[in-house]
C-alpha cells in the first residue's frame, strides 16, 4: 500500500516538472544559465582570493628576515638613491 502511494506521488511530481518544462522551457534554460554564471563567479572569486605563490614567498621572506638584514637592505636602497641623485647632479652640471 505504501509503495503504491510513493509511486503515485513520484509520478505526479514528475508530471508537474515535465509540464513546467514543456510550458516554459526558456525559463528553465535561463535559470540554468543563471546558476551556471553564479557558480563561475564563485569559482572566480575563490581563485582571486587565493594568494599567489609570489605573495606567499614574500611573506615567508619578511618573517625570516632578521633586523640586521632589514638594516642592510635599507642601507643599500639609500646608497642606490644617493648614487642616482649624484648622477642627476653631474648631468645638470654638464649642461
From Swiss-Prot:
Coiled coil: none
Keyword Repeat carried by entry: yes
Residue ranges, annotated region (Disordered): 54-95
Keywords: Abscisic acid signaling pathway, Calcium, Cytoplasm, Repeat
Chief place of localization: cytoplasm
Region feature (6 X 5 AA approximate repeats of V-E-E-K-K): 30-94
Top-level taxon of origin: Eukaryota
Inducing stimuli: Triggered by gibberellic acid (GA) but repressed by salicylic acid (SA) and abscisic acid (ABA). Suppressed by a high concentration of calcium Ca(2+) and of other metal ions, including magnesium, cadmium, manganese, nickel and zinc. Repressed by glucose, mannitol and sorbitol, as well as by sucrose depletion. Up-regulated by cold treatment (e.g. transfert from 22 to 4 degrees Celsius). Down-regulated by flagellin peptide flg22.
Biological-process GO terms, alphabetical: abscisic acid-activated signaling pathway; cellular response to gibberellin stimulus; cellular response to sucrose starvation; response to abscisic acid; response to calcium ion; response to cold; response to glucose; response to mannitol
Keyword Manganese: no
Positions of Sequence repeats: 30-35, 39-43, 54-59, 67-71, 75-79, 90-94
Gene Ontology terms: cellular component: cytosol
Listed name of the protein: Cytosolic calcium-binding protein 3
The species this protein was found in: Arabidopsis thaliana
Lineage per the UniProt record: Eukaryota, Viridiplantae, Streptophyta, Embryophyta, Tracheophyta
Amino acid at each position: 500500500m505504501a509503495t503504491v502511494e510513493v509511486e503515485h506521488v513520484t509520478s505526479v511530481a514528475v508530471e508537474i516538472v515535465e509540464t513546467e518544462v514543456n510550458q516554459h522551457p526558456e525559463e528553465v534554460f535561463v535559470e540554468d544559465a543563471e546558476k551556471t554564471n553564479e557558480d563561475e563567479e564563485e569559482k572566480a572569486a575563490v581563485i582571486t582570493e587565493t594568494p599567489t605563490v609570489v605573495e606567499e614567498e614574500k611573506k615567508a621572506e619578511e618573517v625570516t628576515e632578521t633586523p640586521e638584514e632589514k638594516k642592510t637592505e635599507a642601507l643599500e636602497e639609500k646608497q642606490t638613491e644617493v648614487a642616482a641623485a649624484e648622477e642627476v647632479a653631474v648631468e645638470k652640471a654638464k649642461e
